[in-house]
Amino acid sequence: MLFLTKDLELIRKQLYEGVNLKMSDLSVEDLLDDINTDVMTPAWVCFDHEPSVIAENAYAGLLHEGRRVFEPRALKDGGFEVIVSGHRKGTGSSRETAPQCERWSGIRIVIAESFAPIHERNNLNLGQLMGDHSMLERLQDGERIPLTEFTEGYDPISKLILESGGILPFAKRLKSGEVTLPANDCGPRPMNMIEKMISSKLLGRGDEPGFVKPGDAVLAQVDGGYSHEFTTAQVHTFLSDEYGDDYALPKPSKFAVFEDHLLYATGVARFSRFESKIQTLRDMQVDFQRHTGVRDYSAVGGISPGICHQVAREEFIDVGDFIQATDSHTCMGGASNALSYGVGSTEYANLVHNQFSFVSVPESIRFKLVGELHPGCTAKDIILHILWKFAANSETLDRSMEFGGPGLASLSMDERATLCNLATECSAKTGICEPDDRTVEWLLDRRRDLTESQIRSRFVLPDEDAHYDGGTHEINLLDIRPMVAHPGNPDEGVPSDPTNGAYIDELGDVRIDIAYAGSCTAGKDDDFSFYAMVCEAALKAGLKVAEDVDCYIQFGSKSVKDLSERKGWTRIFEEAGVHLIDPGCGACIGAGPVSYTHLTLPTSIQV
């Protein structure tokens, strides 16, 4: 057993000097709290896709006096089967590599006082048993604890997944008839949008209508999804390992791969030692696409067709769809009245192969929009208001954010996409907009295979007396003012957090060095019309980008770039001194383009 103590030197002694500890000699307060997934597997570790290789650098981000506490292979070669920590294990990024580094190092039981929800789910999908410190003391006293004690706190389906050893072995048992799904006993009730969407996808019900309520654990049929080059290699590996090298996908036509995250990483100085691994990730995505026949959105001539979330909503997310993808901003699809959110690589491997996903029906919070925004205000200001007034109080936490009301009709589809995209910054499960005439018009403009009647027939609207655990909150758009997310001050304990909102007119003059516009949130048609409006006004006033400021604008997709050229916006940007960047996610994750590597801007999404 390995105890992750606040005394980091004591961890070293366990790893390298054979020191054995007992829980009875410690208290929970002696153990590390809030172990971040970036500590368990820093970003550079994620360039490896084989979990066994990832495990060689387990906890590479845990440093003491500038030196790694866990040297390479320390956990893997330590012979540990149980790992122990304090409160909130697995905070931060939802990366699945974090629990993978433990599982493939031989860890079979993870003990903590509490777990971050997504990290707990990732452990569950891998079949990792989780317990508390009282169970650990019993184990150390020689007691045998039955599996049922490790699973008793979970819903019936999660129990089956754990007992099966993870989501992929569970899917095999389900298909063979070795296990059966417990009946969902929810009777008829008024439902909100996410409840209706989930109830219409319940596995095994056919055309029979179903009902769900918050907290219900169900399996739901997935309509489509996508992955990108940072995650596809693992998906391909997991499916090959589980089903053999000749595995096939039953319905590849509505699944896709995108080359957008690492497109510009080659040449970035800090990634130079990982170039071969990055290329392997790219190559394996190509192999996966050719093997499965999913939609191919690879770069052509070094230029990506677009950022995955933008292209997906343009080309294949339909009203009422259930879409899952390996990225947290997948919820952008909710603008099209679809249910969409991000999942880990193992979950995605299961759903793309078996066409179902585990769903714990979330609670919902409704935002009723009234009035219209003032000129100069956008949907970004609405979501920053929600972050400040609601998310900061955890009112949106793990809930579905439902947007409706007469004010929604005044927002374009691109502005609605901004609202839904940023639901993840509110720590929400997803965001969903009510459909209307604008939904129909926007989709018909982009899909020759759809008709108005087909689109309207799939509309999902809440029942009039639907219940919202988070309440219904009216937001008068006339009250919204331009805002920014405060950059924070780590020296004073103020995090860089989008809930730290500030009104622009109260900031005074703030000197800037870099201006960036783009990302999945802000690289859409309407966003570019806003940028062009500002740049054109500047040019008319005899102004350009200041000499000591670098200004970048990045297209969200090829179609956005084409529109910019047709409208003359590209010429306006160039005359104003803006640097234009082809589509990609590099700026948000610090992965290039090479001349713009200082653009490590999560604020491109949040602000």
Model-identified regions with their sequence ranges:
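Accessory "access/gating" subregions that flank catalytic or transport cores
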Residues: 306-315, 320, 426-545, 553-566, ...
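N-terminal, positively charged, Ser/Thr/Ala/Gly-biased leader segments
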Residues: 1-46, 183-208, 220, 224-228
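Glycine/serine-rich anion-binding loops at beta->alpha junctions
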Residues: 81-103, 312-340, 513-526
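Active-site cavity-forming subdomains of large catalytic enzyme subunits
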Residues: 127-154, 161, 281, 290-416, ...
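Glycine-rich ThDP/TPP pyrophosphate-binding loop and its adjacent helix/strand module
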Residues: 169-172, 176-177, 374-375, 385, ...
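Acidic, glycine-rich flexible loop/linker segments
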Residues: 117-188
